[in-house]
Amino acid sequence: MISRLFAAESRSFAAPENLGTEAFLTEHTGPGEMTLFLWQNERTVVIGRNQNAWKECRLDALNRDGGTLVRRLSGGGAVFHDLGNLNVSFCVPRAEEDIPGQTQIILNALQKLGVRASRSGRNDLEIDGRKFSGHAVYRQGASSCHHATLMLNVDRESLEKYLCVSPLKLQSRGVDSVRARVVNLSERFPSLTIPALCTALKDAFSEAYGLPAEPYPWKERLAGNGGDRLRSLQDRFSS
């Protein structure tokens, strides 16, 4: 049973730091604890655990533009991150894993801001039949991490420039159809902002469990070897 909630927001826009921090939060989740982690990456392609980078993105273009490529711990497809995207992570003991419940927190937060979204399939959220959020999960020891992207105002030109669309998708749907399936929330809700979304997510997180979301206890968790472990995890995503 969840008895304590934490909320953490990253001040870094560097993908290796953020993915390392997410892994640290997941690894250091105690019994009955749950952490909401909110973070953003600047000009980054994130590929799934088993993906071939050369097949999923145009590495030459990404490198030429000073972008970053990282491999996350979860499976799923390649995604493009910039500062128009918000990443949401739920770090929790495996015994308390509740993907539908955590997804509902995101939907509730969006509803607070006037956005009525719905689930599509196993891993997506959409509005009017167009996807703005993808989800994935990984498990690490006794802990679980469910993370999601939320496209608020992502640069669509960069997304199309760096990501390779599957030939099968192009063959079956066509370029225009593939583009039309993805939407920025700002296209429908131009006044929506990242800070407002972060506040709504923290409020919905707290309301879902009837508990206050405390600031993450960094001083306590980084004591002893904690700081070295965090740096080690961040370095792993840099290589």
Question: What is each residue range found by the language model?
Answer:
Residues 1-97:
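N-terminal lobe of the biotin/lipoate ligase/transferase fold
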Residues 55-56, 65-75, 101-106, 110-113, ...:
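Short acidic (Asp/Glu) patches
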Residues 55-57, 96-101, 158, 193-196:
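Short, conserved charged micro-motifs
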